[in-house]
Amino acid sequence: MLGVQKKRSTRKTAARKTVVRKPAAKKTAAKKAPVRKVAAKKTVARKTVAKKTVAARKPVAKKATAKKAPVRKVAAKKTVARKTVAKKTVAARKPVAKRVASTKKSSVAVKAGVCMKKHKHTAACGRVAASGVKVCASAAKRKTNPNRSRTAHSWRQQLMKLVAR
């Protein structure tokens, strides 16, 4: 009896299923616009009113006026006495001595007296070269260097300087 399982007892009458009732689908009634009842109008006896006779107006003859341009009034100019201003005495400028392009001297003689840069020399500007010749510190030799290539920018800068003078 060990190998045989006990058979479970089953109901002979089928268990009734509980039927869930679906709620009846509500029909959405089309809304009717509320109809206003118009009150019956009572006929009222009108009183006869004596009509006043109105004198017919004559149309006024319009005058065609030529449009005048608005005239501006010019304010009368008052003569104002001018104050005499004392003239300031300006110191007469001395004409700058122009350098005459001298005929080429020996290069040593030229270097000894004149720096290539055209400006006022300051203490910081000058340095004494080994030979004892005073040369401007800001690469005076650069201007005379034949290997130097000029850009369009440098040309422009030079032109601007010349114009400024």
From Swiss-Prot:
GO molecular function, one term: DNA binding
Name of the gene encoding the protein in the UniProt record: hctB
Native organism: Chlamydia trachomatis
Name used for this protein in its record: Histone H1-like protein HC2
Organism lineage string: Bacteria, Pseudomonadati, Chlamydiota, Chlamydiia, Chlamydiales
Region: Disordered, residue numbers: 1-80
Keywords linked to the UniProt accession: DNA-binding, Repeat
GO biological process: chromosome condensation
Family in the record: Belongs to the histone H1/H5 family. HCT subfamily.
Pfam families: HC2 (PF07382)
